[in-house]
Every structure is written in structure tokens, then in C-alpha cells.
Amino acid sequence: MKKRVLILCTGNSARSQMAEGLWRHEAGGRFDVFSAGTKPTKVRPEAIAVMKELGIDISGHRLKSVDEFLGQEFDYVITVCDHANEICPVFPGKTQRLHWPFEDPTDEASFRQIRDQIRARIHSFVA
């Protein structure tokens, strides 16, 4: 049975979207991975662009609110920003909650930097 992972940030616009795409790419289908936001906005074009550089297309990802996942069981709930960590809801079952804080990217260079940091973290986790 696949492990279920939910990645949370505030806007579900950059860090969590990149993490979802990277996790799916790195894990080769061994996990069911979702991302969501506490206050979803829109996927940032910079996130789409820097992921495309790696051959990962997140342009079809839709924004999701954490509310869509309340009551579901996950093996891991990972927050990637401090705000999401502070207000992360409780999920049923034996969910392991992890906090991987990443800075909010502001320009294309910082999007690449954060993407690479997230990728390294995921790679070491799923290896």
C-alpha cells in the first residue's frame, strides 16, 4: 500500500506545489502525494517555469484548500512554511507531522534555490 503524503503551505502557490511535483517525480509512484494551502491563491508562474527546467510539468496542478483533506488519513503531513505549521489541523490516524521550513521565494533565482532545497530534502526522505 502506498504511503499518503500531504504537503501544506499558506497559498499552495509555490513551495507546496513544487514539492508535490518533485515528490511525484523523485518517488516514482511509491507515494500518493497531495498539496494544499491554508489560504490558497494561485500557482505562481515562476514555480511552473523552474519546475519545467527539470522536465516536471506542474502547470495542470489545481489549487487546493486544506479543508478538502480534513478527516482523511495521511502517513505524513509536511508543512513547508511557518504559518501553515502554526495552524496545521489535526488529521486522524497515525499521521506523522513534519515541518520543513523553506523561505518564500521572491524572484526566479530564489525559486530555483528553494526548488533545489526541496528536491534535496525529498530525495533524502524517499531514498
Task: Give, region by region, the residue ranges found by the protein language model.
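Conserved active-site segments centered on acidic
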Residues: 2-67
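Mid-chain, well-packed structural core segment of small domains
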Residues: 61, 67-92
